[in-house]
Amino acid sequence: EVHPNGIAIDKLGNIFFSDSGGSKLYKIGRDRVITAIAGTGDFNDSGDGGLALNAGLRSPGGLAIGPDEALYVAEQTTHRIRKIDSNGIITSYVGNGIFGYAGDGGPAVKANIKNPFRMKFDKVGNLYFSDRDNNRIRKVDVNGVITTIAGHSNIGWLQDGLEVRITVHNFP
């Protein structure tokens, strides 16, 4: 049973989607043929530095195509965002796998995040993502440094007129 979650389309028109229940990523080519591109189907966190097809994925969700044409996947239950390059190699890009909030001003790959959900790159190459269970929007700049853009730990609702770092978010 397939549970489609995230979706992304590259500049060639290939469609990528995550199967959160099956712990895999798929590509639908322009010829409409579906091919698995990442994940063994096992619900585990493994394979960094190796082929994405041999890697374990846990709850893959949001997807984004980076300016480098790599595919980025938010793994909600491993608290990471991983990158799959054009050679099919998977590496951690954001998050150290520790459930929590820490790391602003330092390397994104060493930061604690909680349940990354959706993400988007800007024109310059900065990555913005919802750090959902931390109630924050965070940014990874082109140098790999993570910062918080909006939100804080208290659960609440958006409030018009407040500076974004003060405004409370409830699972962005």
Can you annotate each of these PLM segments?
Residues E1-K11, F17-D19:
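Beta-strand-rich domains and repeat architectures in extracellular enzymes and scaffolds
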Residues E1-N5, V33-S59, I89-N115, V145-P172:
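Gly/Pro-rich loop segments of beta-rich domains
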Residues I9-L12, I65-D68, F121-V124:
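Residue-level detector of Asp-centered blade-edge/turn motifs that repeat once per structural unit
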Residues N14-F16, A70-Y72, N126-F129:
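Conserved beta-propeller blade signature
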Residues S23-K27, V33, H79-K83, I89, ...:
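A short loop-to-beta-strand structural motif that recurs across blades of beta-propeller domains
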